[in-house]
Amino acid sequence: MDSNTVSSFQVDCFLWHVRKRFADQERGDAPFLDRLRRDQKSLRGRGSTLGLDIETATCAGKQIVERILKEESDEALKMTIASVPASRYLTDMTLEEMSRDWFMLMPKQKVAGSLCIRMDQAIMDKNIILKANFSVIFDRLETLILLRAFTEEGAIVGEISPLPSLPGHTDEDVKNAIGVLIGGLEWNDNTVRVSETLQRFAWRSSNEDGRPPFPPKQKRKMARTIESEV
């Protein structure tokens, strides 16, 4: 196993522990708490994949971080922070909408790279909007936290989420996953549109109804894909 992979996991475990202690003091905001919860799932998945104990990794990560801080001057820290581009966290959904449990009458699921696409194919003839919480850097989607499909009544009928055991995805990965989700929902004559935030950062152009400009041939292909593979 690559030593960098192990040490990276150890540092991530310790930094998560620090953030958890901060949250336990009731000082974290909603985006902070949301990232904390999702990173916990990711660490568990990575630990299982690597065969490493999280508690042991956390202790090792603490030693690595302490060694770095001991060698780091305040001036070097300021320069490092200034040189790193800042990402923004954008929220279409409330914390309640993100954490709400939902159930499917006709569950369908597809794994596309490091993203999991789920939907209820019992939903028909509904107006549906896609909402997402994600980070943005350089005016492009950086990391998807969670995307969900809502009916006008507020029911959740679809979802795209990163797989904890396979971290890392691009904005193109997210765009393709959204296309698959839209194709699957439209197969049952639902009308799907995306939020203004997703329009701005996931696509550079969209139709008047808030849809990405998928041609009819691509829409049919996506619908067949979700029907046959999900």
From Swiss-Prot:
GO MF annotation terms: protein serine/threonine kinase inhibitor activity; RNA binding
Lineage: Viruses, Riboviria, Orthornavirae, Negarnaviricota, Polyploviricotina
Location of this chain's protein in the cell: Host nucleus; Host cytoplasm
Function: Inhibits post-transcriptional processing of cellular pre-mRNA, by binding and inhibiting two cellular proteins that are required for the 3'-end processing of cellular pre-mRNAs: the 30 kDa cleavage and polyadenylation specificity factor/CPSF4 and the poly(A)-binding protein 2/PABPN1. In turn, unprocessed 3' end pre-mRNAs accumulate in the host nucleus and are no longer exported to the cytoplasm. Cellular protein synthesis is thereby shut off very early after virus infection.
Domain notes: The dsRNA-binding region is required for suppression of RNA silencing.
UniProt record similarity statement: Belongs to the influenza A viruses NS1 family.
Region annotation RNA-binding and homodimerization: where it falls in the sequence: 1-73
Protein name (database record): Non-structural protein 1
Disordered, as annotated region: 205-230
CPSF4-binding: region residues: 180-215
Residue numbers covered by motif Nuclear localization signal: 34-38
Region (PABPN1-binding): 223-230
Protein keywords: Eukaryotic host gene expression shutoff by virus, Host cytoplasm, Host gene expression shutoff by virus, Host mRNA suppression by virus, Host nucleus, Host-virus interaction, Inhibition of host innate immune response by virus, Inhibition of host interferon signaling pathway by virus, Inhibition of host PKR by virus, Inhibition of host pre-mRNA processing by virus, Inhibition of host RIG-I by virus, Inhibition of host RLR pathway by virus, Interferon antiviral system evasion, RNA-binding, Ubl conjugation, Viral immunoevasion
GO cellular component: host cell cytoplasm; host cell nucleus
Short sequence motif Nuclear export signal: positions: 137-146
Cross-referenced InterPro entries: NS1, NS1A, NS1A_effect_dom-like_sf, uS15_NS1_RNA-bd_sf
Principal subcellular localisation of the protein: host cell
Organism expressing this protein natively: Influenza A virus (strain A/Shearwater/Australia/1972 H6N5)
HAMAP family: INFV_NS1
Gene Ontology biological process terms from the UniProt entry: symbiont-mediated suppression of host cytoplasmic pattern recognition receptor signaling pathway via inhibition of RIG-I activity; symbiont-mediated suppression of host gene expression; symbiont-mediated suppression of host mRNA processing; symbiont-mediated suppression of host PKR/eIFalpha signaling; symbiont-mediated suppression of host type I interferon-mediated signaling pathway
Post-translational modification: Upon interferon induction, ISGylated via host HERC5; this results in the impairment of NS1 interaction with RNA targets due to its inability to form homodimers and to interact with host EIF2AK2/PKR.
Subunit-structure text: Homodimer. Interacts with host TRIM25 (via coiled coil); this interaction specifically inhibits TRIM25 multimerization and TRIM25-mediated RIGI CARD ubiquitination. Interacts with human EIF2AK2/PKR, CPSF4, IVNS1ABP and PABPN1.
